[in-house]
């Protein structure tokens, strides 16, 4: 089930909306929060202050849907402002890091409905923490898909068009586009500066570590 149809008063829950960029995550988050406001529930909305693309005091979708929000520097700041809320919305959850997990759990245990939207994969198509862990503890999960700009297929990956250092580079269409699995891989292979495509879950080889250990022992003997 992706969204609760009915919950008992005081029953907390966690809802997670994940997908690539341009897949409608923020639009879906705004839709749920507006429905809660129409139902006259007390709503508090948060986003990380690193997300300054469109507005400092609002969550804004790529299609310009917006709803007022509060910017926070770290996940723990949410607890200071959410005490009276019945429904809590959090956009761009991946930017708040693993510290978001205990915050969300605490809010749900307090009987609050918590809705988190964010990227489940980074620009290399690797799991973007803490979203995979949030998926594991959520009662309700929604996976949104974009449209591949290359072939028009359903897209679940975010392709970085320009070479920038670092995992987190905040930007819009000038930097990122949605791609399907095939077109994402083709783009990565065609980029001379891109990291090699491999198994994101592969464990690092033990051989380099063994060589370093042997070299260290030899230095101590000398």
Say what each PLM segment does.
Residues 2-83, 122-133, 146, 162-164, ...:
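Conserved P-loop
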Residues 12, 39-41, 110-112, 137-140:
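Short glycine-/polar-rich loops that comprise or flank the Walker A/P-loop
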Residues 82-96:
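Conserved P-loop NTPase "ATPase switch" module shared by AAA+ and STAND
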Residues 89, 113-120:
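Structural recognition of the conserved hydrophobic beta-strand(s) that form the central parallel beta-sheet
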Residues 92-107, 121-128:
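Conserved ATPase-coupling elements of RecA-like P-loop NTPase cores
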Residues 140-149:
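Conserved AAA+ ATPase "SRH/arginine-finger" region at the nucleotide-binding site
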């Amino acid at each position: 089930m992706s969204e609760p149809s009915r919950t008992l008063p005081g029953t907390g829950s966690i809802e997670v909306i994940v997908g690539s960029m341009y897949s409608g995550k923020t639009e879906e988050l705004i839709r749920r929060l507006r429905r809660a406001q129409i139902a006259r529930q007390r709503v508090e909305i948060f986003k990380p202050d690193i997300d300054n693309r469109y507005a400092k005091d609002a969550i804004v979708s790529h299609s310009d849907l917006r709803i007022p929000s509060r910017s926070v520097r770290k996940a723990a700041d949410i607890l200071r402002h959410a005490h009276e809320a019945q429904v809590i919305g959090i956009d761009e959850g991946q930017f708040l890091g693993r510290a978001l997990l205990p915050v969300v759990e605490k809010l749900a245990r307090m009987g609050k409905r918590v809705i988190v939207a964010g990227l489940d994969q980074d620009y290399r198509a690797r799991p973007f923490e803490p979203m995979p862990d949030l998926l594991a503890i959520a009662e309700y999960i929604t996976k949104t898909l974009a449209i591949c700009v290359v072939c028009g297929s359903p897209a679940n990956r975010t392709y970085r068009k320009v070479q920038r250092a670092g995992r987190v580079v905040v930007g819009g269409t000038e930097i990122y586009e949605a791609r399907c699995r095939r077109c994402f891989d083709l783009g990565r292979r065609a980029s001379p500066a891109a990291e090699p495509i491999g198994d994101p879950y592969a464990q690092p080889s033990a051989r380099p570590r063994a060589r370093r250990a042997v070299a260290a022992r030899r230095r101590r003997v000398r």
